[in-house]
């Protein structure tokens, strides 16, 4: 079981996944984009999304695919903080290549995708996220259109406490007793 949690930047995805990992014991794969930005800012080279969006999206796509393959042997559920769909959506937007072409032959996630809505009260720009809330909304709307077109069923997270969100996710995915 490979579950994708995606949606609006600053929607609380990473914090929610931290709860699912630490409190509920699930394996979690961290967001590829943030890992890439940290590496570049640390001097490891590579593309930043605000300087080279196509190069960044290509790197995020490769990292997301490597992440998926790295946990392919794990039989327990695994949660992904963003992933192939996010990177492919960004690459399609910035390059004009159809997303279906980008994803052709790449692994898929489980049909139900957890979708974080825009949450302005949580959104913060920082050294790793330089874009503003308007850009985050545009990305959210692109993902909202792409998911059903690719055959995924998105389930929108409620704007509730972290523990209530974690319970909602587990219930929505049938992972509770």
Features from the language model and the residues they span:
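Hydrophobic anchor at the beta1->P-loop junction of P-loop NTPases
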Residues: 5
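The conserved Walker
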Residues: 9
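Hydrophobic positions on the alpha1 helix immediately C-terminal to the Walker A/P-loop
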Residues: 16, 20
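Conserved substrate/cofactor phosphate-moiety recognition/catalytic segment
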Residues: 22-63
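Glycine-rich phosphate-binding loop used to anchor ATP phosphates in small-molecule kinases
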Residues: 57-108, 123
